[in-house]
Amino acid sequence: MQNYNAKSIEVLTGLDPVKKRPGMYTNIENPNHLIQEIIDNSVDEVLAGFASKINITLYEDNSIEVADDGRGMPVDIHPEHKMSGIELIMTKLHSGGKFSNKNYTHSGGLHGVGVSVVNALSTRLEAEIKRDGNVYHIVFEDGFKTKDLEIIDNVGKKNTGTKIRFWPNKKYFDDIKVNFKALKNLLEAKAILCKALTIKYSNEIKKEKLTWHFETGLKGYLDHKLEAETLPAEPFIIDNFSNGDSYLDAVFCWCEDLSESIKNSYVNLIPTPQDGTHVTGLKNGIYDAIKAYIEKNSLSVKNIKITANDSFAQLNYVISVKITNPQFAGQTKEKLSNKDVTNFVATAVKDLLTIWLNQNPDEARQIVENISKVAQKRINADKKTTRKRIMNTTIRLPGKLTDCISSDVNSTELFIVEGDSAGGSAKQARDKNFQAVLPLKGKILNSWELDADTIMNSQEIHNIATAIGVDPDSDDISALRYNKICILADADSDGLHIATLLCAMFLKHFRKLIENGHIYIAQPPLFRIDIGKSTFYALDENERDTILTKNSKLPGKVNIMRFKGLGEMNPAQLRESAMDVSSRRLLQLTISDVYDDTEMLDMLLAKKRAKDRRDWLENYGDRASVE
């Protein structure tokens, strides 16, 4: 082992940190997040009042172009760095004009890494800027400038804007193909949240053109998305509420049918799928208003005390805040962390909702009744759990479960493994200190259209529920026995089928576990590749080919082994490729803010949707994957 001293320390400069660890800066499943970074810059121009149009074009060569009619990126020379503003923005992390409020009052591009990350992870990037009566052009390849900034044309001085076209580098992404549905949902959301914005979308691959412009903004949005009955019948709307520097737009209603649940949050029009302080403020404000209304009107039910979670359980909402200095947890801007936003949103929501409740007593009482029912179910579930604990000082765990030594729920893991054979290998491959293994026999029951009592008649599902310590259809996960619950199935089509059924079961009957980040899908390899003394694992044919290409100059004989299933792997191979914390690949199961997960699984698994399923398979079946 080499000595660890000052010489061992690496200092990554320029865009090297992004290229070295791209997953720290963007979502590497596909280029969608890169597109969003550029769109967010254009939206910032709209929010600042300098733009009203954004055009997105997807080309057949997998390049993407985003153009706006904003002020145009700066092209003058920076006094300190001695390079043009556009080159500085593209090649230096943490450079930008949004760290103060001089140029943008409300912006999402705070970290100053967005567009430079796009440049770093692209084989080529071209920027065209219309500014000061000129059209400027500059080119980058692999993050480096290859063509100096030059004037290529002249335009009227009022004709301004920025156009960026980039080609994602496939070596940094699982797939360089854009997820069209996710992108279109994002664009629609941007247009809904920004009344002044017109977005045009052109997909040359699918020969599709769309335009979004919503003069009414959030008004009627939930009506459009929700088919079930809601309370209130007309969703409650907060329109452009301001305290001076911050602005709040929100629309929400309660709906007993949770299959269509909509919970979307945004900061300066950037989606925050992991929520944050603005959603906490919404939750607190609603709870405070409901609680005060119950006390004022003596509507409390004996022995039932509602909580903030009770008032939020059946809520469908879209909340959008515009603030001057957004702070996010992480570079991908998925969770807002500004503490002052909680109080701003909570105060506004409480005051406005209180007025509405007093003005609409009939609907207000119905809302209180529904929330009280939710609280009653929670209390009953808590009592049931308490009785179980009293009756069973030691939980009677399934006989097939090989448990771990540790009882620290923050560190333990359960692998639900397809097949007894693979289960045996997994038991030998695991770290017995914190990893438990539960083998499944055969295909699991399709539980999508079944209730909790029915699915518990299935021995396999009963074993899963008992092992993890959570009852199906329960919001109480206080007895959860493992921090990570990992689905480990074969990498072939049968394994994907089983993984899909398990994902559907967790989404339908153990949703709280997904919402709290406890469900994962292990990604075992389909191939083992030995090149001389080096060993690689590949998830599929594409990754196999990429590995072979990247390592074509390595000395030694090439040997490729295809695993027919987990059972073909010896414990050492299974440990290294699927279970070892340092080398495995886990995919966290999440509830998307842009995909309609429930609708997709309903179409795939519901008996009544046979025709829809057949149509979908004919059109998109070759692109299906478990996500």
Swiss-Prot record:
Binding sites annotated in the UniProt record for Mg(2+) 1: E418, D490
Cofactor(s) this protein requires: Mg(2+); Mn(2+); Ca(2+)
UniProt-listed CDD domains: HATPase_GyrB-like, TopoII_Trans_DNA_gyrase
Notes on activation and inhibition: Pyrrolopyrimidines inhibit both GyrB and its paralog in topoisomerase IV (parE).
Annotated catalysed reactions: ATP-dependent breakage, passage and rejoining of double-stranded DNA
Keywords of this entry: ATP-binding, DNA-binding, Isomerase, Magnesium, Metal-binding, Nucleotide-binding, Topoisomerase
Binding site for Mg(2+) 2: D490, D492
Cofactor mode of binding and number, as noted: Binds two Mg(2+) per subunit. The magnesium ions form salt bridges with both the protein and the DNA. Can also accept other divalent metal cations, such as Mn(2+) or Ca(2+).
A UniProt-annotated Pfam family: Toprim
UniProt cross-references to SUPFAM superfamilies, sorted A to Z: ATPase domain of HSP90 chaperone/DNA topoisomerase II/histidine kinase, Ribosomal protein S5 domain 2-like, Type II DNA topoisomerase
UniProt enzyme class: isomerase
Site positions per UniProt: Interaction with DNA: K443, N446, H497, R613
Record has Magnesium as a keyword: yes
GO cellular component: chromosome
Alphabetical list of NCBIfam families matching this protein: parE_Gneg (TIGR01055)
Function recorded in the entry: Topoisomerase IV is essential for chromosome segregation. It relaxes supercoiled DNA. Performs the decatenation events required during the replication of a circular DNA molecule.
Protein's name according to its UniProt entry: DNA topoisomerase 4 subunit B
Native source species: Francisella tularensis subsp. holarctica (strain LVS)
Lineage of the organism: Bacteria, Pseudomonadati, Pseudomonadota, Gammaproteobacteria, Thiotrichales
